[in-house]
């Protein structure tokens, strides 16, 4: 089973990663986990003002923060794990990576910030669920 789990450095994404690892261990031999961090692009014009190198450093720092927490949660797992970082619209990038890697299951954390905020702004998890045929497990 190929499991894709999204991380952002938060406690809830660490919980989602631990859940994905547990699932992979219980599944058939050959299961693997891809740990994905997606950083949204900077606002238009920012790169022009601060420079390409500063934007690259900003994204690198964000990826490092997300993966630092993930690596701590991984410990000494026997499950094959690969880290993937990307820059783009979060939900769309998650879906693209999942499709490219022929993912069998998506595991995501939900911050549960409330129904009103979810209706007004939309959440990444609800966008992903609405646009995929891949099974999705939401961890809270």
Predicted regions span which residues?
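General small-molecule cofactor/ligand-binding pocket signal
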Residues: 34-36, 82-86, 137
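Structural beta-alpha unit
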Residues: 72-106
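Short beta->alpha linker loops
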Residues: 50, 85-89, 111
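Small/aliphatic-rich secondary-structure junction motif
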Residues: 1-52
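Gly/Ser-rich helix-loop-strand patches that form or flank binding pockets
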Residues: 96-140
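Aromatic/hydrophobic pocket-lining residues that form π-stacking "cages" and hydrophobic walls in ligand
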Residues: 20, 70, 94, 128
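A short acidic, glycine-rich active-site loop
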Residues: 52-65
């Amino acid at each position: 089973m190929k499991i894709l789990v999204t991380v952002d450095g938060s406690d809830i994404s660490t919980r989602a990663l631990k859940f994905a690892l547990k699932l992979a261990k219980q599944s058939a031999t050959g299961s693997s986990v891809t740990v994905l961090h997606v950083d949204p692009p900077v606002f238009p014009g920012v790169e022009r003002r601060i420079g390409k190198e500063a934007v690259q450093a900003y994204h690198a720092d964000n990826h490092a923060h997300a993966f630092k927490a993930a690596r701590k949660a991984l410990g000494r797992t026997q499950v094959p794990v690969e880290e993937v970082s990307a820059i783009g619209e979060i939900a769309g990038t998650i879906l693209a990576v999942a499709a490219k890697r022929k993912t069998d299951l998506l595991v995501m954390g939900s911050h549960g910030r409330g129904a009103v905020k979810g209706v007004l702004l939309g959440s990444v998890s609800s966008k992903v669920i609405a646009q995929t045929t891949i099974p999705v497990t939401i961890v809270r």
